[in-house]
């Protein structure tokens, strides 16, 4: 069978699609992925055929960019957002319509769902969606509502271009919940209450490629030579103020007598001097390194949050007011395996206090207990692939 997978965003947004795509490819299917141009190399490195669409996504969650947007006139922000989305949606429609010709199923994410649904209807094939958090837990502000209206107008125009009648409701066959059910108790029962009014929404757990990095062996050797460190990472799309960030981390860990492992990601920490209790690398394999750490501090991406929970260590989420990051901060707090704070309010003093709290034995004990309830990565990928195969066969 032929599967078209399309996801726009950073590595954290794209990797779940690549993980299930790689499994489908292993099973003998034809798989093609549509991603932002800056993610094309990543997809191809995983052995998948890729097609680029839309503008570069690397700056969308950049901390400086987000901070500057908050300081701008709302009109300027709106114009910038409209320009970006107009370009993205136009390329998205053209690219996906072409790729879906001859496909058996289209898999996409929540932001692209409405446009993908039109393409799937036009091609007469089923549509599946990957959800990284419950979409009913996300409440857009005024700008988000304006964008929603823009999207609806664009969707209507797309349907007219494709010769489709006016949409009457959701046309998704399958919505895979790529996170753990335990993170949102009651959600499965809520979906069941709606019965046939909603698509199938199975929980499979987080989807990851678990790719090794060049730094893994070096980092594990450094960890083995001393006490277990605290991991600090900021995701694949976030740049931070390097000098201030390293100084804040170094000061807090020194006060607590802890070592710090900092993964710089897109930020350049190489020129910044740091103390002997701090090690800086670009990236590590979470599955290999997290279990050797005392705790994990990160931005609150769905994938990193799941990796920390699977490793059975406490979590501190320093979130930006974008996407699902505040949602995952609330999850670790509710499960009592961590704490959340907005990144912009973090100081050396607050970081010291927050780390002291989550390093308490009771947090570690609860984190270990939650880890036993998490789905294994290989099982998550296999379950997602099974669901997609079954949906594609039914749609033939």
Predicted regions mapped to residue ranges:
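Active-site-proximal region of nucleotide-activated glycan assembly enzymes
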Residues: 125-186, 191-199
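Conserved nucleotide-sugar donor-interacting segment of glycosyltransferase catalytic cores
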Residues: 85-152, 182
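Donor-nucleotide binding loops and adjacent catalytic segments primarily
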Residues: 182-295
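A donor-sugar binding/catalytic signature common to diverse glycosyltransferases
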Residues: 105-108, 281-329
């Amino acid at each position: 069978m032929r599967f078209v997978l399309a996801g726009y965003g950073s590595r954290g947004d794209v990797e779940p699609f690549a993980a299930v795509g790689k499994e489908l490819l292993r099973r003998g299917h034809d798989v093609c992925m549509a991603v932002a141009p800056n993610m094309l190399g990543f997809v191809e490195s995983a052995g998948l055929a890729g097609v680029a669409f839309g503008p570069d996504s690397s700056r969308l969650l950049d901390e400086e960019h987000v901070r500057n947007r908050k300081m701008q006139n709302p009109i300027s922000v709106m114009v910038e957002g409209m320009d970006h989305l107009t370009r993205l949606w136009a390329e998205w429609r053209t690219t996906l319509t072409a790729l879906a010709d001859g496909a058996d199923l289209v898999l996409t994410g929540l932001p692209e769902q409405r446009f993908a649904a039109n393409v799937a209807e036009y091609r007469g094939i089923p549509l599946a969606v990957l959800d990284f958090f419950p979409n009913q837990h996300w409440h857009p502000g005024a700008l988000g509502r304006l964008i929603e209206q823009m999207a609806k107008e664009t969707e209507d125009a797309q349907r007219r271009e494709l010769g489709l009648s006016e949409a009457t409701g959701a046309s998704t066959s399958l919505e895979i919940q790529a996170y753990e059910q335990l993170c949102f108790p009651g959600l499965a029962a809520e979906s069941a209450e709606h019965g046939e009014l909603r698509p199938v929404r199975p929980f499979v757990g987080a989807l990851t490629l678990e790719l090794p990095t060049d730094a893994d062996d070096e980092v594990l050797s450094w960890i083995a030579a001393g006490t277990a460190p605290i991991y600090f990472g900021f995701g694949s799309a976030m740049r931070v103020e390097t000098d201030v960030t390293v100084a804040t981390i170094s000061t807090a860990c020194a006060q607590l007598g802890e070592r710090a492992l900092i993964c710089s990601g897109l930020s350049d920490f190489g020129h910044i001097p740091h103390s002997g209790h701090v090690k800086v690398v670009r990236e590590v394999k979470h599955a290999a390194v997290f279990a050797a750490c005392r705790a994990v501090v990160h931005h609150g991406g769905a994938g990193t949050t799941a990796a920390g929970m699977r490793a059975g260590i406490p979590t501190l989420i320093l979130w930006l007011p974008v996407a699902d990051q505040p949602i995952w901060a609330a999850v670790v707090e509710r499960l009592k395996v961590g704490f959340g704070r907005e990144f912009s309010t973090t100081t050396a003093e607050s970081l010291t206090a927050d780390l002291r709290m989550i390093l308490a034995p009771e947090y570690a004990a609860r984190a270990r207990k939650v880890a036993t309830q998490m789905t294994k990565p290989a099982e998550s990928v296999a379950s997602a692939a099974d669901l997609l195969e079954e949906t594609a066969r039914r749609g033939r």
